[in-house]
Amino acid sequence: HNVEQTITMYDVDNYMMCGVPSTAFTEALAFVFQKRDLPLLGYVTNDAHASAYQMLDIFWGSYEIMGVSLVDIYTWRWLYENPNATMPQLKEAIIRNAQEIWNKYYAPIFGHENSTILAVYSHMIDSPLYLPNYPYGHIVESQLEAQFKGKVVGEEVCRIYPIGKLTPNLWMQHAVGGPAVLQIGGR
């Protein structure tokens, strides 16, 4: 986060363009760096399946955070419909939303209904509608990683992030040569 914010605060040509299109682009760079933390500390794996495991990890992380993101969206929709809600009512709504989303998207896989696990994220109240940026950030990350192959990551980051706060697709066009798209079955 600090790398992105430092670059987009000090290296963007126009002050009004400082920043990124959304926090999904901040999260994307954080994900890029998180992947490199253990190798930087000397923990290197030569596992032939590492790339496949990484793809599975990204998929699973996205699947998990998408459920929480839906709880966030449903909860804020409920709050706008109930502006005088009390804290106990809000708590009930969050739990109800979490169970509804769990039952629709997770229970068929896990075989357990009415779980409230998706209600545990405090981000949804602390930082409204921030959570949906995580899955979008994984899509951006995937395309950035493809762009970084065979290149020096730091140089690419310094080339891409000073673009500033453009529309998401224009930013992606400059960064990777195309719009943000989800590619199934490979990068």
Predicted regions mapped to residue ranges:
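C-terminal, non-catalytic "cap/extension" segments appended to globular domains
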Residues: 32, 61, 65, 69-187
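Catalytic Zn2+-binding segment of zinc metalloproteases
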Residues: 1-14
